[in-house]
Amino acid sequence: MTWLQNITKESKIWIVNYACAIDYYVDLNKQKNSVLIPGGKGINVAIVMKSLGFDPTVITFLGQPTKNLFLELVKPYDLNIVSFISETKTRINLKLLKDEKTTEINDLSPLITDANLTELLTFLKANVKNNDLVIINGRFKFEALEKVLNLVFTLTENVVIDVDESKMLTLLNQSKPLVMKPNIDEFQTMINTFFHDQQSLIAAIKKFHYCKLLLLSDGDKGAYLFDQNKLLFVSSITPKQVVSTTGAGDTLLAVFLANLILKVDLKTALIKATNYASATISKLGVVDSKDKISVITPKSYYL
């Protein structure tokens, strides 16, 4: 089955990311070790897809005095970035590393005026074609997300959503995205149900008909994929070492989408995505073109 509608070689991949960031990693085990890495869900997805031979464009808001630093940090990845003005600085997120755990202190969302948001919407309307893929992810203000979704669903059927928003099902307003990718906590909040065991989670997933493909990440347990007919579970792969879990979910989504575009079957796509997510956990930032990923086959079964 072809999940993406009318995708051709001329189709473009647009990543709408409200708030990119600079991730400042500090290793508390080695107090002198700190690293700055470009971050935010959209940037992470773009870096991974670029490493797989795709050429996505990130559409975002950037603000001074940290805008130039962000652009300098992202330059080695050779990404296409279309930016609009944020009235406040590009975020700096603090990531504290200690004993295989990452403590995250995330900066405030940027201040975006109605006029600046209108510029972004105008750009989307002028550039997105009906055979393009639009990925909406990251932090959004509710009103901005509502406007972006309302517009994008009129432009293409190939819409992917990875946004932590408790009222997401209301915002969809009967529109059906191609893919939704919540993690387990976001999924529970979105459907206002909390699970005490795997069976209750499975039952809830099988009742979820708000998208064509539900890709749900469940931390170190693995990932679920529901295509409105079959529910597939792929167990996680133990990484060689745990450096930081930041970006693992973004990597999972990026690799899954890349394989979807290449018309790889869903099971193989999710297995490959799981391998890449494991590799991301073994480093700072997400996997890129310099990383060599050896694919192993984890446990997988239909539920």
Curated annotation (Swiss-Prot):
A GO term for molecular function: phosphofructokinase activity
Database matches in Gene3D superfamilies: 3.40.1190.20
Catalytic reaction(s) noted: beta-D-fructose 1-phosphate + ATP = beta-D-fructose 1,6-bisphosphate + ADP + H(+)
Enzyme active site: D250
Species for this entry: Mycoplasma genitalium (strain ATCC 33530 / DSM 19775 / NCTC 10195 / G37)
EC number: 2.7.1.56
Reported phenotype of the disruption mutant: Not essential, it can be deleted.
UniProt protein name: Putative 1-phosphofructokinase
